[in-house]
Amino acid sequence: MPVLTLSSASSIILTSKLPRQYQWLDKEPGPKMLMEGLNHYGCLEHKGKGNNPDITKWAKEIGGKVAEVYRADEIPWCGLFMAICARRAGYALPKDPLWALNWGTFGTGQPVAMLGDVLTFIRKTASGATAGHVAIYVGEDDTAYHTLGGNQSDCVCITRMAKSRLYAIRRPQFRIAQPKNIRRVHLASSGKLSANEA
């Protein structure tokens, strides 16, 4: 049975679901988008005709064009995951938030990625077209960012993304003050690199 932990941000985190390398995240007090994202850790896309009702409910909660366009969890949903994290944390969404690279306009640009930042990445589709991926920074090693995101291996999880694919680093515009735990996090380079998040 999973162990539930109530964080200082009043979020329930399923601590037993986080891999050992990332269990230190359970003790982090924020930022809010990261805490919201951790609440969904392990959420899986359903294969075939059925859809995960949690994922499709996110689209309805965001509303507008997102609810009109997003009707199945087999549609790339990294932008939808980021939208639900941002909305529930109280932040305005970029235009057309389902498009990952549009998150390159969210918040404020940063020269160095730190805990809780929104990172966008370039990816190539099967046809060779340029597309994107968006996720939340939890750390880095020499060659990769470790990111919490949706539609990473068809679920919400933490994976390694090659630094060479980075498109933009964005930080939420904090209303009061930047949380004190915003920092670079150096991690071991274990696990394979993500190659395609579609």
Where are these regions (language model features)?
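N-terminal capping segments
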Residues: 2-89, 180-198
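Residue-level marker of intrinsically disordered, low-complexity segments enriched
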Residues: 1, 10-11, 53, 120, ...
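Active-site signature of cysteine proteases
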Residues: 142-183
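Short alpha-helical interface elements
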Residues: 61-66, 106-111, 172
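...with weaker cross-activation on analogous glycine-rich loops/strands in unrelated enzymes
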Residues: 26-31, 91-157
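Short, Lys/Arg-enriched charge-dense amphipathic segments
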Residues: 67-82, 113-133, 174-175
